[in-house]
Design a protein with these regions (language model features):
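A glycine-/small-polar-enriched, mobile loop at the entrance of the PLP active site in fold-type I
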Residues: 2-6, 27-35, 226
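Active-site core segments that coordinate phosphate-bearing ligands/cofactors
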Residues: 3-16, 20-21, 44-223, 232-256, ...
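Short beta-strand to alpha-helix junction loop
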Residues: 9-11, 35-39
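A conserved helix-loop-beta module that forms one wall/lid of the active-site cleft
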Residues: 16-37, 261
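Glycine-rich Rossmann-fold phosphate-binding loop(s) that bind the pyrophosphate
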Residues: 229
Length: 309
């Protein structure tokens, strides 16, 4: 409901003014269901198919990212998260919405989280750039692409990953080359150069968004937790740490599924609260920590990136 933007983030109720503009009333909507609410039991049909019996059905977080954020293995609240996949979503958890001219100007959103929290976040382009390039290439593995990228010259070409040019081009590879030509940069010629351009540009974009996020957050950000499928990309994680200048903790990669399970565990009494739930995930899931390296080099590259973005 909060993602649909019909809910007043402060009152946590449907916004009457918006409903009036749309010719709707609260009677047009069902009751709000919150993460952890028991909504019933399995239907007879599903019981027969699965053999599970009349087990309870528990509402998890509102969608995949919300459940993934529930699985962030943080040991305190001074963290930001990056849900990394086709798209990247970066944010912090807050107790109350942050609504002001700055959040509007920077295009941050306030969405519902678990245990009454708000997810103050921004959507960023992610591995979409590489996935679309791979459509144009012969079958090649991620390890091969990463090795080719590592062997290329650093910061030869950079792009703004959120430029409209990359929304849905006929050829992502050609779109990247066009962007570089239009911005008077060397044009990537090889796969490795394109992949390096994508990863370096994403890392620097993450820094830009994180700096904006820190200016909005009610608490300091001391670590960036990368969750989702992109957390398996060690090279991107290391470059992200280099760019943002704080430790990056990667994992779990299956954060959405783990978050779903843990919300059900909370309802079942197997975990006492979100803090203990996250501590359990931290102890149970292999995590990797990446500390910043070559910070001055990345600071210089960031200044160049800002001229593009």
């Amino acid at each position: 409901a909060s993602t649909a933007q019909l809910v007043n983030a402060e009152t946590r109720c449907l916004e009457p003014a918006l409903l009036k503009e749309l010719g709707l009333t609260e009677d047009n909507f069902g009751r709000f269901v919150y993460p952890g609410d028991k909504v019933g039991v399995l239907t007879k049909e599903i019981q027969t198919i699965t053999g599970l019996g009349a087990i309870p059905v528990i509402a998890v977080a509102g969608h995949d990212t919300a459940s993934a954020v529930a699985a962030v293995p943080a040991l305190d609240r001074n963290f930001a998260y990056l849900s990394s996949g086709t798209w990247s979503l970066m944010g912090v958890e807050t107790d109350a919405p942050v609504i002001n001219e700055e959040t509007e100007a920077l295009n941050f959103t306030n969405e519902g989280g678990v245990a009454g929290t708000i997810r103050l976040l921004k959507n960023i382009c992610g591995m979409w750039l590489l996935e679309r390039c791979r459509c144009d290439w012969e079958e090649i593995s991620y390890p091969e692409l990463i090795a080719e990228a590592e062997a290329c010259e650093p910061f030869r070409s950079l792009i703004n990953p959120d430029d409209v040019l990359f929304v849905n081009p006929m050829s992502m590879e050609q779109a990247i080359r066009t962007y570089c030509a239009d911005h008077h940069q060397p044009i990537p010629e090889t796969r490795g150069q394109i992949v390096r351009c994508i990863f370096e540009s994403l890392s620097l974009r993450y820094r830009q968004v994180l700096e904006n996020l820190c200016s909005l957050s009610p608490r300091p950000v001391e670590v960036l937790h990368v969750i989702g499928g992109g957390s398996r990309n060690d090279l991107l994680n290391q470059w992200t740490a280099n760019a943002v200048g704080i430790p990056v903790v990667a994992g779990p990669s299956e954060a959405t599924a783990i978050g779903n399970v843990m919300i059900q565990a909370l309802t079942a009494g197997a975990a006492s609260d979100v803090v203990s739930m996250r501590q359990l995930i931290n102890r149970s899931i292999p995590l990797k920590t990446f500390t910043p390296e070559n910070v001055e080099v990345w600071n210089t590259a960031y200044l160049h990136f800002l001229q593009l973005a």
